[in-house]
């Protein structure tokens, strides 16, 4: 063996030793790994994006909900998922807007179904959750295509589809090559066929939203039916009594499917508390949810939830 070949072998050996054999995933791959592992810890979902201030990351002002600024803030602070709403404008363009009108979130008025993309592009988004007193920003109404492009490779999207446009939405996701970076969800009752196995829904991460009719539905039975010959990524919980949770946890464990809940407002599990309570005492609210079997939490306070998760993962 020549001196040159010895040096080459030595260099290759050093490179091999320097590279971890099973390096932990990073970026969006790490988020995918966390979501798809039911034992992967808390998944942080930012409701309508990170529109709240995030002072620990230098964001002292609010951003408009469902905006590119709110998405980019989520990426910057390390949120796992941005939840955002999809509707169809008058010309068929899919856009990110929660309400059926533009009144609350922009400086315009009118029904979205009567406005084209050209109309929408003239409007400015109001900061945070909008309203007549909310300041105007330089942010504009975002198309689904723009939202997909801005999030690709950085963060997952949880698309709350507000119109009967599921096929068009999933087709757009597929064209963007983001089937494993997008969550779609739809409501499921006791008579609903397993949604995750249906065409379109079977191409993306899918969460059935369990319908709690009159607050007394057999949610565990609905979840069991939704897992029959299908594999949803999670069951999204409705507003519910705490007494309904243990049976759902048993179903989720039996089928290796996560549970997702909103801690928005007063919280969706009666007696557990909501975001305001959690910001004062995160372990009492978010910690209790997690210990009791709920591991995907949607919040308007993603920075605080991320900080709480970090304390759990230090141990």
Which positions does each model-derived feature cover?
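Bacterial N-terminal signal peptides that target proteins for export
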Residues: 1-8
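Bacterial N-terminal signal peptides
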Residues: 9-18
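Phosphate-group recognition and catalysis centered on beta-loop-alpha active-site segments
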Residues: 23-315
